[in-house]
Amino acid sequence: MLYKGDTLYLDWLEDGIAELVFDAPGSVNKLDTATVASLGQALEVLEKQHDLKGLLLRSNKAAFIVGADITEFLSLFLVPEEQLSQWLHFANSVFNRLEDLPVPTLAAVNGYALGGGCECVLATDYRLATPDLRIGLPETKLGIMPGFGGSVRLPRMLGADSALEIIAAGKDVGAEHALKIGLVDGVVKQEKLIEGAIAVLRQAITGDLDWRAKRQPKLEPLKLSKIEAAMSFTIAKGMVAQTAGKHYPAPMTAVKTIEAAARFGREEALNLENKSFVPLAHTNEARALVGIFLNDQYVKGKAKKLTKDIETPKQAAVLGAGIMGGGIAYQSAWKGVPVIMKDINDKSLNLGMTEAAKLLNKQLERGKIDGLKLAGVISTIHPTLDYAGFDRVDVVVEAVVENPKVKKAVLAETEQKVRPETVLASNTSTIPIGELASALERPENFCGMHFFNPVHRMPLVEIIRGEKSSDETIAKVVAWASKMGKTPIVVNNCPGFFVNRVLFPYFAGFSQLLRDGADFRKVDKVMEKQFGWPMGPAYLLDVVGIDTAHHAQAVMAAGFPQRMQKEYRDAIDALFDASRFGQKNGLGFWRYKEDSKGKPKKEEDAAVDDLLASVSQTKRDFSDDEIIARMMIPMINEVVRCLEEGIIASPAEADMALVYGLGFPPFHGGAFRWLDTQGSAKYLDMAQQYQHLGPLYEVPEGLRDKTRHNEPYYPPVEPARPVGSLKTA
């Protein structure tokens, strides 16, 4: 053994070839600060071996290196800019030493090589991959850019266009594509990986392969003519401006850095990467996006822990077909859980099967599946008008019309047709779980399972714990949701549960703005372009359905009369009374017509202004800041109340539910991350300016306490250790 660290070791393999093996404790390798330092120490040993002829890098895990240790990011990003810059210089000196070894080097890459893992293998001369490889640089999705030389080496290896596509979009690619663009030099079966790697190294050692020529372009300026450079970078900047926009600075910074570094050799190019990375790491956007990643891991980990002793359902059923039922059936079947889809008429069943077939055909058109796979999946969805097969079902979700009498009757009837241990769930969005459970003989086997539309796209499923729901029931439904590829978040029962409960105060803020003379078009524009929502409130109401919102608004007002009962006729009432139900009937705040792809396209409709004039004061202009404050304060206050009342268990789960269920702008990180970034004192000052507007704008006492004690909602993070100690970790 030449060297042994905590996460890697170095040893002789054969005939002058050494192997450097990443083998961290636990299931995966991460390129954390300690591993970077350990890699430096291993290279120090290696540089002294006079009989060294070649070096093989490999992993003892199912994945090569999954990336940097993102749990370290928040503390690293608090280190002063100069110290963070110094540490990056140190880390890059380690990868440069790997790249500068006087012998050929090869990385045998299996599974994942992402982020820092990808940057590590870019420093070797050759890369041999297994067919299951996913390799790429996802840093821009975390609000940063490659910091270990990825923005320097990748363009010099692949050319500007391919590298820009991967870096700016934060993409990873499979083995076949990586081979095609030159990111790897060969693809071999896992069992042949080491043998193949040694064979390539031997060819390089004997001179049959010119490893020096392979290395040289990575050390030099990017080989691009002025015209080629102008075209590549102009197109890339245009695409990034269009897709990322101003709220996500990392992709544009990465493109501009690669452009500026193109005319320099490695050292100067790395300096430019360093100068761009450090300011990005100190942005609120980076902290928010890293926070989302960590919250996602927390939520998924909690679901995994909850279901560790639970068998995933093997057979499911959906009550009620149509678009929603068909979407749920598709998602279950697509992820490998056969499903019975029951309805009371053929027309609805046909609609449900058509929806599932349409979604599968889209997968076929995109080349994700072949005809055989399509036929296999669709055959696991069994449409029926009766209860045949329900005695074999492990879990049933009811998705019939949003009417308590109908739902209770359907659930009670179904309970008689299934085994005693079968779990029943309701996809209700507003009806209290306790009310539905009252119709059942086994309420402990019942809970809420709230999907979001469209089911195949929306990641969140709210699992609602009723007063009598057993832990096992919750765990079984969480297991099914996880198997479906969804992110399940368990909430306690209340009107609207969590997501709808916090959404309707936001809509109430919108209604008050319109009542006071705001133009809905400007409100939408500000909330989309300035705050960052994917849709403004008017457009969102049209998509949800004005009739659906009108009904839900009444339910919420009955549930929370003190805050959500209104004493005036609002825009939702006016549109509902005029039978303008949104996209579903082509008339809402906008008029809708199908575009060339058959998707609804919104158009101005002057008739709306006349309708809204009856429920609003004279038009007046509101500043962007005032619109944002009046829209967001009711939502934020309600989110805080939900945490205080135990409806949602943690800030992390609340923020992920908002991001995954409502499209809360990820660069804000969620309501609690946004609050912590603003500071509760600043938020309180802002909210108090609007408390005259009514109870929705009154800040909860718990948030006032946070302000008095200067406490954040997320645990405080300490800056990482001084950079000098990182070097010798």
UniProtKB/Swiss-Prot annotation:
Cysteines paired by S-S bonds: none
Superkingdom, natural source: Bacteria
Binding site for NAD(+): M324, D343, V400, V401, E402, K407, S429, N453
Residues that coordinate or bind substrate: D296, N500, Y660
UniProt-listed Pfam families: 3HCDH (PF00725), 3HCDH_N (PF02737), ECH_1 (PF00378)
Pathway: Lipid metabolism; fatty acid beta-oxidation
Location of the region described as 3-hydroxyacyl-CoA dehydrogenase in the Swiss-Prot/TrEMBL record: 311-729
Keywords from the named record: Fatty acid metabolism, Isomerase, Lipid degradation, Lipid metabolism, Lyase, Multifunctional enzyme, NAD, Oxidoreductase
Keyword Cytoplasm appears in the UniProt entry: no
Reaction catalysed by this enzyme: a (3S)-3-hydroxyacyl-CoA + NAD(+) = a 3-oxoacyl-CoA + NADH + H(+); a (3S)-3-hydroxyacyl-CoA = a (2E)-enoyl-CoA + H2O; a 4-saturated-(3S)-3-hydroxyacyl-CoA = a (3E)-enoyl-CoA + H2O; (3S)-3-hydroxybutanoyl-CoA = (3R)-3-hydroxybutanoyl-CoA
Site (Important for catalytic activity): E119, E139
Gene Ontology terms describing biological process: fatty acid beta-oxidation
Alphabetized InterPro entries for the sequence: 3-OHacyl-CoA_DH_CS (IPR006180), 3-OHacyl-CoA_DH_NAD-bd (IPR006176), 3HC_DH_C (IPR006108), 6-PGluconate_DH-like_C_sf (IPR008927), ClpP/crotonase-like_dom_sf (IPR029045), Enoyl-CoA_hyd/isom_CS (IPR018376), Enoyl-CoA_hydra/iso (IPR001753), FA_oxidation_alpha_subunit (IPR050136)
Location of the active site: H450 (for 3-hydroxyacyl-coa dehydrogenase activity)
Molecular function terms from GO: 3-hydroxybutyryl-CoA epimerase activity; delta(3)-delta(2)-enoyl-CoA isomerase activity; enoyl-CoA hydratase activity; long-chain-3-hydroxyacyl-CoA dehydrogenase activity; NAD+ binding
GO CC annotations on file: fatty acid beta-oxidation multienzyme complex
Region (Enoyl-CoA hydratase/isomerase): 1-189
Assigned EC number: 4.2.1.17, 5.1.2.3, 5.3.3.8, 1.1.1.35
Region (Disordered): 707-729
Record PANTHER family: TRIFUNCTIONAL ENZYME SUBUNIT ALPHA (PTHR43612), TRIFUNCTIONAL ENZYME SUBUNIT ALPHA, MITOCHONDRIAL (PTHR43612:SF3)
Function: Involved in the aerobic and anaerobic degradation of long-chain fatty acids via beta-oxidation cycle. Catalyzes the formation of 3-oxoacyl-CoA from enoyl-CoA via L-3-hydroxyacyl-CoA. It can also use D-3-hydroxyacyl-CoA and cis-3-enoyl-CoA as substrate.
Subunit relationships: Heterotetramer of two alpha chains (FadB) and two beta chains (FadA).
Family the UniProt entry places it in: In the N-terminal section; belongs to the enoyl-CoA hydratase/isomerase family.
The protein's name in its UniProt record: Fatty acid oxidation complex subunit alpha
Organism (species): Salmonella typhi
